[in-house]
Amino acid sequence: MDYKIYEDIPHTDIWIRGIVLLPAAIILVTAIFTWQESLEVTLYMIGLAFLSSLVIVFIIPIKYCIYNTKIRIEFRGPFAFNIPFETVTSIGDPRWFTVGINLPTNMSQSSAIEIARKGRMSVNITPSDKKAFISNFEKAFQDWKKGKDI
């Protein structure tokens, strides 16, 4: 049975919020200028702005949890992404360029963590307390390894 060891929220900054809202804002401004020409196009654009905002809201993580057997990245609603300890090879500062699953919530690399995995893409996250996240992961990972060896 899994039990939670540590929980953290993403470290966010104002730049990410602006970047996230920019596509919807551009679509809405364009819709305002087109409403006199075609009401139908304006309604489509408002719907597109709403849909794109909704998608962005659902793909930004809201919580990072360390369990006794996995790391769980939680999103809004019932959505979550699990990283079993069996697949983790290392955790630490991200490399300069990585190809993988990037879930950044800020523009600074100082709070970013890369979770490298065996045979799978690495995952980049940005917890608010990087040191506490890494130390709690290392403790949980060592305890998991000890329990696995028995």
Where are these regions (language model features)?
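A short, polar/proline- and glycine-enriched secondary-structure boundary/capping micro-motif
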Residues: R17, P84-F85, I134-E138
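Short, intrinsically disordered/low-complexity patches at protein termini
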Residues: V29-T30, E40, W96-F97, T105-S108, ...
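Hydrophobic alpha-helical transmembrane segments
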Residues: E37-A49
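Non-transmembrane, membrane-adjacent beta-strand/coil modules in membrane-associated proteins
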Residues: E74-A132
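Charged phosphate-binding loop/patch that engages nucleotide di/tri-phosphates or the phosphate backbone
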Residues: N136-I150
